[in-house]
């Protein structure tokens, strides 16, 4: 997973979007931010967010925390997003990238309630989840997906747990139809389920994908929304 977070075009595109939002928030606030990366994985996003303030990484998996610590992230916490408190009004920004969908998150509202309590008033939540159950396939089996979401479902959950949604949009618009076809093929192949993120791409193709995603990110960062995609991204305030 560490290699994927560092080199895969999908992670590069996602992290570029998050950094855009956090950079703008740091400029708005005018001081270093207290940032939590909830579900930090191996810590690549934590590393990228360090220039904007004090970063804390939390994850339920001890191996993920060990990998994050190896990157030089000092503040790491083992945390169950449903069962464990994150404290009250501790953070200016919380990122939660592809965590809420996981089968280990047995109560979405409890998880979002924990994130809401941990944010300071006016604080920013950046969250992403996989989109559309019709895209469910071998990748979802490999990464323990409990469910996929429509945009309106994520918006409703955020509002029900006290957030003010500032942006909610699908991401990776051109990938929707290819992903749907790919899911159908990989459902039928009968092989061992594999995450799409372990599949390699030619370097030239990966670079083209990153160029497109960064252009899309520029649109999302100024409030443009997309009608379809393979993920749902939202920015919300407490």
Predicted regions span which residues?
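Conserved S-adenosyl-L-methionine
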Residues: 163-173
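A C-terminal cap/extension of S-adenosyl-L-methionine-dependent methyltransferases
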Residues: 175-238
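Short, glycine-/aromatic-enriched active-site segment of Class I SAM-dependent methyltransferases
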Residues: 125-147, 153-156
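Short N-terminal helix/helix-N-cap motif within the alpha/beta-hydrolase-1
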Residues: 47, 104-108, 137
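Short catalytic micro-motifs in class I SAM-dependent methyltransferases
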Residues: 98-102
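Conserved N-terminal segment of class I S-adenosyl-L-methionine
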Residues: 1-89, 93-97, 112, 219, ...
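A short glycine-rich, Lys/Arg-flanked "PGG" loop and its adjoining helix->strand segment in the class I
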Residues: 109-124
């Amino acid at each position: 997973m560490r290699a994927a977070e560092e080199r895969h075009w999908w992670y590069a595109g996602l992290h570029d979007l998050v950094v855009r939002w956090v950079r703008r928030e740091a400029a708005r606030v005018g001081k270093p931010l207290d940032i939590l990366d909830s579900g930090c994985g191996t810590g690549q996003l934590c590393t990228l967010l360090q220039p904007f303030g004090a970063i804390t990484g939390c994850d339920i998996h001890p191996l993920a925390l060990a990998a994050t610590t190896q990157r030089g992230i000092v503040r790491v916490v083992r945390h169950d997003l449903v069962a464990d408190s994150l404290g009250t009004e501790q953070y200016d920004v919380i990122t939660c990238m592809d965590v809420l969908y996981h089968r280990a998150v047995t109560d979405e509202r409890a998880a979002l309630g924990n994130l809401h309590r941990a944010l300071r008033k006016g604080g920013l939540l950046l969250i992403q989840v996989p989109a559309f159950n019709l895209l469910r396939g071998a990748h979802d089996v490999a990464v323990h997906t409990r469910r996929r979401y429509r945009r309106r479902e994520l918006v409703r959950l955020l509002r029900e747990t006290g957030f003010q949604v500032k942006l909610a949009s699908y991401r990776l618009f051109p990938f929707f139809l290819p992903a749907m076809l790919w899911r159908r093929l990989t459902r039928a192949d009968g092989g061992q389920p594999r995450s799409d993120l372990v599949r390699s791409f030619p370097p030239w193709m990966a670079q083209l994908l990153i160029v497109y995603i960064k252009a899309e990110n520029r649109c999302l960062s100024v409030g443009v929304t997309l009608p379809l995609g393979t993920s749902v991204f939202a920015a919300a305030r407490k």
